[in-house]
Amino acid sequence: MKFVSDLLSVILFFATYTVTKNMIAATAVALVAGVVQAAFLYWKYKKLDTMQWVGLVLIVVFGGATIVLGDSRFIMWKPSVLFWLGALFLWGSHLAGKNGLKASIGREIQLPDAVWAKLTYMWVGFLIFMGIANWFVFTRFESQWVNYKMFGSTALMLVFFIIQGIYLSTCLKKED
């Protein structure tokens, strides 16, 4: 359910763009959906996690700039900025002697610190790659960016999760 909730504004953005072929209208729908979603989550849980706050700020800033200036490049930059901020957070926490990934999901899975470090490197590299890939698509193939955002980046994430799962399964077997 959380996965669908997290993708709600992306799905509405894609649906609106598919019907209207208007990036500004699609951005307006995503902006409203993002704000309503954040308000609902805050009302229900009395808090938003860090990534929800970051996502909200980015959709308001980049979505707002897209709407006010009538320039779709701003909303196209948003995923790259989000990916790069994620990579910066993970790398920065690693350099500070902490593991942001372990802090986020360490309650669900127990791993040695060396494995957490490798996972962090994998995530940092992947997030940098995803930011570059998004930038490449929107600067070279602007008309295809919406399809890439919906399907291409989702497929890349799925492949990354599978690779990560395979890596983790080998690490967990070594521990047994």
Swiss-Prot record:
Plays a role in cell envelope biogenesis, maintenance of cell envelope integrity and membrane homeostasis. Belongs to the YciB family. It is a multi-pass membrane protein. It comes from Neisseria meningitidis serogroup B (strain ATCC BAA-335 / MC58). GO terms for cellular component: plasma membrane. InterPro entries: YciB. It comes from the Bacteria. The chain crosses the membrane at residues 23-43, 50-70, 74-94, 119-139, 150-170. Coiled coil: none annotated. NCBIfam families: ispZ, PRK00259.1-3. It is found in: Cell inner membrane. Keywords: Cell inner membrane, Cell membrane, Membrane, Transmembrane, Transmembrane helix. This is Inner membrane-spanning protein YciB.
